[in-house]
């Protein structure tokens, strides 16, 4: 059986890892074993953070919608409830964009949501005169 010499493949593998680790501090950019460990962790972090990013954007959209809805005298919760009752199917990304860039369209949606909501059940009731 022929002898296998790994010099070329091993050097290429190490070079790729060290190139990915360029820019890291200290030994993590110069020593193969440290660099390999850090590159592996970095790939895991980037994978996880790509998923976290979606939740972060949703939080941002909700904050923007809430601020714009409160400016119109309505909370985020009641606004979304009113839109659902009115049958308006606009996602939070578009609502946040409207709140920032097209205030008149957003205000029209607020009025639609207000009209669709039932009377406030927690409001004090008028006393019936007996």
Curated annotation (Swiss-Prot):
<dbReference type="Pfam" id="PF00453">
    <property type="entry name" value="Ribosomal_L20"/>
</dbReference>
<keyword id="KW-0687">Ribonucleoprotein</keyword>
<keyword id="KW-0699">rRNA-binding</keyword>
<comment type="function">
    <text>Binds directly to 23S ribosomal RNA and is necessary for the in vitro assembly process of the 50S ribosomal subunit. It is not involved in the protein synthesizing functions of that subunit.</text>
</comment>
<keyword id="KW-0689">Ribosomal protein</keyword>
<dbReference type="GO" id="GO:0006412">
    <property type="term" value="P:translation"/>
</dbReference>
<comment type="similarity">
    <text>Belongs to the bacterial ribosomal protein bL20 family.</text>
</comment>
<dbReference type="InterPro" id="IPR035566">
    <property type="entry name" value="Ribosomal_protein_bL20_C"/>
</dbReference>
<dbReference type="GO" id="GO:0019843">
    <property type="term" value="F:rRNA binding"/>
</dbReference>
<dbReference type="GO" id="GO:1990904">
    <property type="term" value="C:ribonucleoprotein complex"/>
</dbReference>
<dbReference type="InterPro" id="IPR005813">
    <property type="entry name" value="Ribosomal_bL20"/>
</dbReference>
<protein>
    <recommendedName>
        <fullName>Large ribosomal subunit protein bL20</fullName>
    </recommendedName>
</protein>
<dbReference type="GO" id="GO:0000027">
    <property type="term" value="P:ribosomal large subunit assembly"/>
</dbReference>
<dbReference type="InterPro" id="IPR049946">
    <property type="entry name" value="RIBOSOMAL_L20_CS"/>
</dbReference>
<keyword id="KW-0694">RNA-binding</keyword>
<dbReference type="GO" id="GO:0005840">
    <property type="term" value="C:ribosome"/>
</dbReference>
<dbReference type="GO" id="GO:0003735">
    <property type="term" value="F:structural constituent of ribosome"/>
</dbReference>
């Amino acid at each position: 059986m022929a002898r296998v010499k790994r010099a070329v493949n091993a050097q290429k593998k190490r070079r790729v890892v060290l190139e990915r680790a360029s820019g890291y501090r200290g030994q993590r950019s110069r020593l193969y074993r440290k660099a390999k460990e850090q590159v592996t962790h970095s790939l895991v972090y980037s994978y996880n953070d790509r998923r976290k990013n979606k939740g972060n954007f949703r939080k941002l959209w909700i904050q923007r919608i809430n601020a714009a809805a409160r400016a119109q005298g309505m909370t985020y919760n009641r606004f979304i409830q009113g839109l659902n009752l009115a049958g308006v199917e606009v996602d939070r990304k578009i609502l946040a964009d409207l709140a920032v860039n097209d205030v008149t369209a957003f205000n029209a949606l607020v009025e639609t949501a207000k009209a669709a909501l039932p009377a406030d059940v927690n409001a004090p009731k008028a006393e019936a005169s007996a």
